[in-house]
From Swiss-Prot:
<comment type="subunit">
    <text>Part of the 50S ribosomal subunit. Contacts protein L32.</text>
</comment>
<keyword id="KW-0687">Ribonucleoprotein</keyword>
<dbReference type="InterPro" id="IPR047859">
    <property type="entry name" value="Ribosomal_bL17_CS"/>
</dbReference>
<dbReference type="InterPro" id="IPR036373">
    <property type="entry name" value="Ribosomal_bL17_sf"/>
</dbReference>
<dbReference type="GO" id="GO:0003735">
    <property type="term" value="F:structural constituent of ribosome"/>
</dbReference>
<keyword id="KW-0689">Ribosomal protein</keyword>
<dbReference type="Pfam" id="PF01196">
    <property type="entry name" value="Ribosomal_L17"/>
</dbReference>
<comment type="similarity">
    <text>Belongs to the bacterial ribosomal protein bL17 family.</text>
</comment>
<protein>
    <recommendedName>
        <fullName>Large ribosomal subunit protein bL17</fullName>
    </recommendedName>
</protein>
<dbReference type="InterPro" id="IPR000456">
    <property type="entry name" value="Ribosomal_bL17"/>
</dbReference>
<dbReference type="GO" id="GO:0022625">
    <property type="term" value="C:cytosolic large ribosomal subunit"/>
</dbReference>
<dbReference type="GO" id="GO:0006412">
    <property type="term" value="P:translation"/>
</dbReference>
Amino acid sequence: MRHSKSGRKLNRTASHRKAMFANMAISLIEHEQIVTTLPKAKEIRPIVERLVTLGKRGGLHARRQAIASLRDAGKVAKLFDTLAPRYASRNGGYLRIMKAGFRTGDNAPMAVIEFVDRDVDAKGAVDRVRTESSANEKEASS
């Protein structure tokens, strides 16, 4: 029986899940917005929120814990130097999940996960698609 077992398996082994969540967290910290399936977005949210809380703590031990989780010192530096000060006055709730329809092909529910007060200059996947499509429309109309 599966009583009180938290988290989704997502049809992956434990090591695959751990690597996938680390990669998704790195992408989310880099772009501040990613498009993924809804179950993956719901699973990655507590992981990244915990990392932002580590960044707010700011000590050497917290930095080493974040590096152990992310495996990318550059993204940990952005987490501690850019994102943590931005959310210094906010107690949790750093991420937003918005439903984004269904994927063509397998009809999987998609979602956009992004930081709440994100920097719009750090273009995420949705912004990149939007700007490319508007540029293509301008070229086609002229």
